[in-house]
A protein has these predicted regions:
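Conserved core of the sugar-phosphate nucleotidyltransferase
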Residues: 106, 119-170
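Acidic metal-phosphate-binding loop of nucleotide-sugar-dependent transferases
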Residues: 16, 115-119
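Residue-level signal for inorganic ion chemistry
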Residues: 9, 35, 93, 114, ...
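Short active-site oxyanion
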Residues: 48-52, 77, 136
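Short aromatic-hydrophobic micro-motifs that form the base-stacking/packing surface
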Residues: 109-113
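N-terminal glycine-rich phosphate-binding loop and ensuing alpha1 helix
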Residues: 2-61
Length: 170
């Protein structure tokens, strides 16, 4: 049996809530696009053998030339178009993983990561990897600090969930 762990990095979002002309995954932080930091973490991780980058159709060439090639992300095996919604892009990434697997790869874990979240680390990958092996699934999350309200169909607050029971998925 051969294990092959793949990271699907989602970078097809339009960032409409930001009202920016530049998609947030391409905004620069300290001279590098936000997407660079996520790809670098997966590139440098010994846990990951393959990266599938899912982006908008209009950004494929940019991602290939200005990010993957420019920064030497050799583990990126495919840059593919995403779908209309996030779940469509995840599905496209999963299909690409299946299509890209060598015959000898019979096991492995698929990491799905939002490319606009640059703070992923080797520690997070290792903990998710261990939990995925143990429980067959894992999601990185942080405890919520804000007060959250559950509203009725008219928008009126009905209940307040306990903060210690609410997590923000990363």
């Amino acid at each position: 049996m051969s294990e092959r762990n793949t990271a699907i990095v989602l970078a097809a979002g339009q960032g409409k809530r930001m009202h920016s002309k530049v998609q947030k995954q391409f905004l620069e932080i300290q001279g590098y696009p936000v997407l660079y930091y996520s790809l670098r973490c997966f590139q440098e991780s010994p846990l990951i053998q393959d990266i599938i980058l899912v982006t908008g159709e209009e950004s494929i060439s940019y991602c290939k030339e200005e990010i993957v090639q420019k920064y030497g992300f050799t583990k990126v095996s495919a840059v593919i178009p995403g779908g209309k919604e996030r779940y469509d892009s995840v599905w496209m990434g999963l299909k690409a993983v299946k299509d890209d697997l060598p015959k000898e790869a019979t096991e492995g874990i698929v990491f799905i990561h939002d490319g606009a979240r640059p703070m992923v680390s080797e520690d997070i990958l290792e903990r998710c990897f261990q939990d995925a092996q143990k429980y067959n699934a894992c999601v990185a999350a942080v405890p919520v600090k804000d007060t959250i309200k559950i509203a009725d169909e008219n928008g009126f607050a009905e209940t307040t969930p306990r903060r210690d029971r609410v997590w923000q998925v990363q």
